[in-house]
A protein has these predicted regions:
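Basic/aromatic-rich interaction segments and small domains that mediate binding to polyanionic partners
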Residues: 33-58
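Short, charged beta-turn/beta-strand-edge "cap" motif at the junction between a beta-strand
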Residues: 10, 28-31
C-alpha cells in the first residue's frame, strides 16, 4: 500500500500506476482507477481517482 500525502516524494507520486493500492492515511483507501496530473503554474497537482469514487489530491 502506498501512502499519499504532502510528504510523499515526487518520484513516488510519479511511480503510482492504475491498480495500485493507495491510502491518504485518513479515510480514503482503494485501488487507483485513473490518474490526472496538471500544472497550475505554481504547483503540480496529482489527482488519484479511486475505484471507490473518492479522489486523493496532492499539490507539490
Amino acid at each position: 500500500m502506498i501512502r499519499l500525502n504532502q510528504d510523499t516524494p515526487i518520484d513516488v507520486l510519479q511511480d503510482v500506476k492504475n491498480g495500485d493500492l493507495v491510502t491518504d492515511t485518513f479515510s480514503k483507501t482503494g485501488l487507483v482507477e485513473e490518474i490526472n496530473i496538471s500544472d497550475d503554474g505554481l504547483y503540480r497537482i496529482y489527482e488519484f481517482h479511486l475505484v471507490t469514487g473518492r479522489t486523493i489530491s496532492i499539490k507539490k
